[in-house]
A protein has these predicted regions:
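Mixed-charge, low-complexity intrinsically disordered regions
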Residues: 1-83
Length: 83
């Protein structure tokens, strides 16, 4: 699995640019035996400054090509150079 980098800049497949603020854990669903299942990515839209939280695995997932056949980006979020 790809590593999501804190302070990394990522492009969402729909075009918005985000900065990862931190990686955290869901306290309500934390599993001590498998803590990776409760990881969350906290990220900020670089233009609007809105903050979002998404499960780590979802942030790191592939674009659904059946639902979005015209999207060429492979992953939901892909790291880019700072702009």
């Amino acid at each position: 699995m790809r590593e999501i980098k804190i302070n990394g800049i990522y492009k969402h497949f729909k075009g918005h640019i985000y900065k990862v603020i931190t990686i955290g854990y869901d306290s309500e669903n934390y599993d001590e035996e498998n803590p990776d299942n409760s990881r969350l990515v906290v990220y900020e839209n670089v233009d609007t400054k809105e903050v979002w939280i998404r499960p780590y695995d979802m942030f790191n997932s592939l674009v659904d090509k059946e639902k979005y056949p015209d999207i060429t980006q492979e992953y939901r979020f892909e790291e880019i150079e700072e702009r």
